[in-house]
Amino acid sequence: MVSALITVAVIAWCAQLALGGWQISRFNRAFDTLCQQGRVGVGRSSGRFKPRVVVAIALDDQQRIVDTLFMKGLTVFARPQKIPAITGMHAGDLQPDVIFPHDPLSQNALSLALKLKRG
């Protein structure tokens, strides 16, 4: 009985590692594509038992949003998605509470993504 539980735990742990690597691979490919389109800002919300949110935006020289990346979820099945509503908008015109009216975690991540780091 104990060896069966240990076996199940090891299989679950290996599956978690494999699926986590798959998720990171998908995110890295999407992020590389985003980085080729201009300057990139990244924002991440945190929370222990809440879905994590990652928002990345690519800006051109006129501070217009060229492309976006949005990931939200608790599990390894969260996929990178786009935010089509803000593509083409000027970064100064964005209001995260209007884009995500009922999602404070996404609002926070978008606010952080709009604050590009110099470097």
From Swiss-Prot:
InterPro entries, sorted: Glucitol_operon_activator
GO molecular function: DNA binding
A GO BP annotation: regulation of DNA-templated transcription
Keywords per UniProt: Activator, DNA-binding, Phosphotransferase system, Transcription, Transcription regulation
Residues within the DNA-binding region(s): 23-29
Chain's role: Positive regulator for glucitol operon expression.
Name of the protein this chain belongs to: Glucitol operon activator protein
Origin species: Escherichia coli (strain K12)
Lineage of the species this protein comes from: Bacteria, Pseudomonadati, Pseudomonadota, Gammaproteobacteria, Enterobacterales
